């Protein structure tokens, strides 16, 4: 049934505060309880506008103050809101950005309060029920309790308002007064019987809200009245989503009514207690404040916020310091460390908080202490240790605080943890030790501290793939590799995990070359898990020096790797476009080998299928024959020097210096470079030894009880060969003769 024109006109007159016209229509017999298209009664509309004369007129004509209007609201609900959204809308529309919510409240609160009290009294006198609830079961007392109007609350209580009435969200009026940080109203409600320990649907009590807004006075009041210090609330995710949608609705409403110029004031209103009448919870407004931090456990929030006074109050009233937040299992002890609240940590320990509590990730406070800045972490670790903390407890990933300290390069924490007896060899779920983390994240200072401590086993790892030496190689960190080698790390993982193959495949020639020259035990004849030999990867690098190093370290090109397959044939089959210099080098090596092995036969058969290879082979073989013809003595030839070049000693060759100096290496150009590396130092060594012998003849004589000059020349050389060339040169130099004491050699 539609609304009559007369009723519509009457509503228009009410909105315009036209008392004369309203009286005229009412006297014509129009029902004062009629509703408009928005489902609002005339009385509710008049109350919303705060038109006292029209309200009185409607009541005098029989308007019922208990009829529900839009959102199940009664006029008494409306008048309990000291500053309604309609008023705010008008202000914004009229003044735009010139008006602020705080300014308006400060200026007009008392005026609004007095006017609203007058209206409320009129409604109650005309039968308004004070315990009526709206669609969210919010009563006028709930609204008044968050409005800041002590007098309005007092009026409602005087007429029997229920202090323990619950909203649909399970909240009493105390939740509303506390969330508005109103000490006086909260105290009044408690005096009138409000239960201080009622928890809403998210298990949030008034005390939790008081801690949330950091109100020391409210916390004291509630604790004095028996509030449960150990209540645990829940996160309010669903509530936040719901209220965000509600915010969008109010913004749409304002936009529809062209109230969209003062965004700041709108947001302030949405986050204020003035809008509580349309919220699901008293705590909703708090969520939209920039400084908001949700509280589920009073003691943890007090610690998070760094409120020493609040924390001590809670603990004094018997709060358990070891209650954790349900969603994160985080304790106050964790927050004291994470937020760098040293005094808070001290307070918690003083009240016997457990130092080794674990959160959801099984981290202890010590795990977080090592993540603090280097300048601060040890201070927290020392306090924790003094209180009995263990530094060997592991988290969900099997890591101790030392693992974490190494990961974050907290060198001071690493030193302190080691000094405190922390186990340096615990392996986590990734098979990482603390050393692994230091190497993995390239924390060179930390690696040095760990290795120099003498407590670390550099070879400890469950899988060779995660060996520190392999990690260092993967990260191309030569400094860490040096430290590990100096600490005696086992180099087997390099061979077993194909570390050299990996470097060659990645074209990391610098580190590959350095490792080959530095570590003598490296395997150069192995194949990786793809059955590719190291030499094949090196051949693709086109770096002849690295290939030479492989050969010097024992690359066996005749090694049989399969049916009719050798290391040499694999290099050619796996590598395309080999450089001429590398081909010549490989052929020269084969040509110098004995001709009776199975591998040699396979290689020779392959060489004979290629004209270029065969030509190079014949050239090399010709030069090998020449070297075999150059005899140095006792059946020893130049080819013997070449074949034994990796093991032959310079002192041995020095004895053949006279013969070596007469050899023209230009006759063997392919092998010349490798022979010169041996022959030139041998000739130089011989000269130094000979000069040292003569010097010794001059400075040592019989009357000084030395019998040097009586020794055969061969014995003299044998003795001098024990000295390195540097010391021999010092002996020869006239300025240092008197500084050298050789008596320990001869006596």
Curated annotation (Swiss-Prot):
SMART domains, sorted: ANK (SM00248)
Alphabetized PROSITE patterns for the sequence: ANK_REP_REGION, ANK_REPEAT
ANK repeat feature ranges: 38-67, 103-132, 136-165, 169-198, 202-231, 234-263, 294-323, 328-357, 361-393, 397-426, 430-460, 464-493, 495-524, 529-559
Keyword line: ANK repeat, Repeat
Domain of life: Viruses
PANTHER family in the record: ANKYRIN REPEAT AND PROTEIN KINASE DOMAIN-CONTAINING PROTEIN, ANKYRIN REPEAT-CONTAINING PROTEIN-RELATED
This protein's name: Putative ankyrin repeat protein FPV222
């Amino acid at each position: 049934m539609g609304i009559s024109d007369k009723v519509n006109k009457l509503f228009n007159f009410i909105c315009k505060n036209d008392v004369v016209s309203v009286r005229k229509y009412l006297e014509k017999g129009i029902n004062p309880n009629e509703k408009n298209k928005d489902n609002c009664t005339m009385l509710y509309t008049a109350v919303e506008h705060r038109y006292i004369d029209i309200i009185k007129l409607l009541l005098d004509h029989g308007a019922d103050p208990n009829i529900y209007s839009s959102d199940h609201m009664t006029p008494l609900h409306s008048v309990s809101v000291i500053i309604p959204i309609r008023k705010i809308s008008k202000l914004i529309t009229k003044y735009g950005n010139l008006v602020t919510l705080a300014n308006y409240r400060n200026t007009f609160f008392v005026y609004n309060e007095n006017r609203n009290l007058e209206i409320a009294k009129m409604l109650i006198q005309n039968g308004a029920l004070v315990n009526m609830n709206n669609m969210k079961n919010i009563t006028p007392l709930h609204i008044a309790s968050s409005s800041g109007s002590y007098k309005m609350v007092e009026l409602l209580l005087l007429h029997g308002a229920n202090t323990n009435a619950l909203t649909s969200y399970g909240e009493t009026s105390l939740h509303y007064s506390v969330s508005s940080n109103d000490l006086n109203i909260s105290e009044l409600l408690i005096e009138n019987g409000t239960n201080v320990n009622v928890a809403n649907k998210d298990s949030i009590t008034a005390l939790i809200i008081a801690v949330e807004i950091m109100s020391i006075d409210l916390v004291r009041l509630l604790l004095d009245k028996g509030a449960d210090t150990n209540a645990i609330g829940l996160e309010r995710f669903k509530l936040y989503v719901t209220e965000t949608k509600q915010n969008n609705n109010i913004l749409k409403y304002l936009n529809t009514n062209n109230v969209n110029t003062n965004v700041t004031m709108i947001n302030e209103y949405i986050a204020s207690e003035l809008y509580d009448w349309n919220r699901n919870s008293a705590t909703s407004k708090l969520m939209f404040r920039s400084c908001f931090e949700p509280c589920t456990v009073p003691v943890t929030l007090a610690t998070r916020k760094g409120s020493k006074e609040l924390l001590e109050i809670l603990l004094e009233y018997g709060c358990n310091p070891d209650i954790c937040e349900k969603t994160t299992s985080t304790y106050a002890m964790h927050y004291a460390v994470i937020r760098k609240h040293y005094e808070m940590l001290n307070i918690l320990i003083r009240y016997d908080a457990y130092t080794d509590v674990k959160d959801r990730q099984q981290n202890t406070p010590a795990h977080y202490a090592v993540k603090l800045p280097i300048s601060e972490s040890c201070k927290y670790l020392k306090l924790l240790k003094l209180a009995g903390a263990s530094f060997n407890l592991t988290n969900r990933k099997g890591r101790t605080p030392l693992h974490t300290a190494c990961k974050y390069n907290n060198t001071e924490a690493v030193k302190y943890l080691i000094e405190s007896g922390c186990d340096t060899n615990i392996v986590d779920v990734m098979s990482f030790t603390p050393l692994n983390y230091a190497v993995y994240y390239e924390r060179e200072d930390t690696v040095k501290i760990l290795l120099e401590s003498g407590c670390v086993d550099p070879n400890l790892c469950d899988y060779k793939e995660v060996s520190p030496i392999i990690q260092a190689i993967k990260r191309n960190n030569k400094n860490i590799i040096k430290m590990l080698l100096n600490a005696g790390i086992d180099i087997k993982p390099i061979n077993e995990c194909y570390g050299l193959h990996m470097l060659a495949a990645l074209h990391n020639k610098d580190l590959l070359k350095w490792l080959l020259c530095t570590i003598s035990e490296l395997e150069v004849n192995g194949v990786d898990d793809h059955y590719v030999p190291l030499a094949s990867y090196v051949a693709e690098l086109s770096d002849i020096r690295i290939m030479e190093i492989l050969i010097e370290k024992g690359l066996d090109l005749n090694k049989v790797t399969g049916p009719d397959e050798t290391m040499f044939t694999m290099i050619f089959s796996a590598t395309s476009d080999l450089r001429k210099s590398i081909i010549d080098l490989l052929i020269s090596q084969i040509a110098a080998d004995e001709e009776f092995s199975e591998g040699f036969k396979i290689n020779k058969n392959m060489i004979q299928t290629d004209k270029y290879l065969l030509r190079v082979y014949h050239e090399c073989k010709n030069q090998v024959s020449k070297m075999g013809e150059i005899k140095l003595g006792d059946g020893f030839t130049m080819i013997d020097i070449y074949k034994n070049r990796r093991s032959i000693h310079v002192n041995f060759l020095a004895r053949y210096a006279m013969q070596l100096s007469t050899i023209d290496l230009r006759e063997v150009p392919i092998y010349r470079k490798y022979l010169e590396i041996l022959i030139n130092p041998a000739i130089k060594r011989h000269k130094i030894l000979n000069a040292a012998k003569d010097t010794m003849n001059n400075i040592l004589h019989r009357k000084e009880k030395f019998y040097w000059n009586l020794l055969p020349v061969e014995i003299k050389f044998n003795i001098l060969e024990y000295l390195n060339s540097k010391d021999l040169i010092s002996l020869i130099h006239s300025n240092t003769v008197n500084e050298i004491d050789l008596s320990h050699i001869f006596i």
